[in-house]
Amino acid sequence: LGDVYKRQELNNRKVAVIGCGFVGATSAFGLMQSGLFSEMVLIDANTEKAEGEAMDISHGIPFARPMKIYAGGYDDIMDAAIIVVTAGANQKPGETRLDLVQKNVGIFKSIIPEIAKRDYQGILLIVSNPVDILTYTAHKLSGMPENRVIGSGTVLDTARLKYELGEHLGVDSRSVHAFIIGEHGDSEIAAWSSANVSGIPLNTFCEMRGHFNHDDSMERIAANVRNSAYEIIAKKNATYYGIAMSVKRICEAIVRDEKSILPVSGMIHGMYGVEDVVLSMPAIVGKNGIERQVPISLDEDEQKQLQKSAQILKEMAEQVL
């Protein structure tokens, strides 16, 4: 029968990070500074790497808030309020996304059952790429309720879109309200039809700022957002600061039960004709994970693009699971 594990009561001030590569370590560093947690456990297939990161990050504690940070194993993480999974291989030059999927699904098949057999009761936050497929994989392998298995989704892409629009318009990017939805990847959709700046429709605001060539600007900005990860990887081999900030933001919404609307990856049932596929839609995020998805208004073209994105993800999931 194997080991019998007793369900553990959650410690709302504890977080676990599985995978101590660039993204995992940077996320752990961001979470240490966030003040959200008083305990953090790091896990990596390479124990020494986890120990080294725990030591290095711990040495910054005197400049932050008191906290316990250590390397551990699966038994150490079962009372964590949130388990952040960043483990996985990175895409190598010349490698297709499908190659990467198969490699990382294999890695998840060794990680997720360890969490599932301990009857974990917290929130599983999947960050490894391709995040939509791996969130779907985590759903299927863990048997956990759908609301408690979340992917980081297009939270970072949406931040990139807000940043680009803020620069374009010369306004604070926090005043820009616009979402990237669908796949976190090449088939992502910028939901232009519902975009606004502090309640003023985007096109109207653009004209107020002297921009009249909307189609060209939208195409250029969407391409910048879509290609920015490739560009960063070409220049410095990996992206990790932006995604670490996204992880911190999602954890904040969960721990503080903020009911924030964030475009995280979750299972979609029937919205816009999309069924049984994990992709990003704005959702209310709080202590129970995804409380509900929020159907933003999409024009006909955006709906078609979303259905196409869903189809791509569905086919990829079928090939690997």
Pin down the residues of each PLM region.
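N-terminal Rossmann-fold NAD(P) dinucleotide-binding loop
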Residues: 24-25
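Rossmann-like NAD(P)(H) cofactor-binding subdomain of soluble oxidoreductases
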Residues: 96-162
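Short, small-residue-biased leader/transition segments that mark boundaries at the very start
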Residues: 1-5
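Rossmann-like NAD(P)-binding element
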Residues: 62-123
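C-terminal substrate-binding/catalytic lobe of Rossmann-fold NAD(P)-dependent dehydrogenases
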Residues: 142-148, 157-321
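Glycine-rich Rossmann-fold phosphate-binding loop(s) that bind the pyrophosphate
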Residues: 20-21
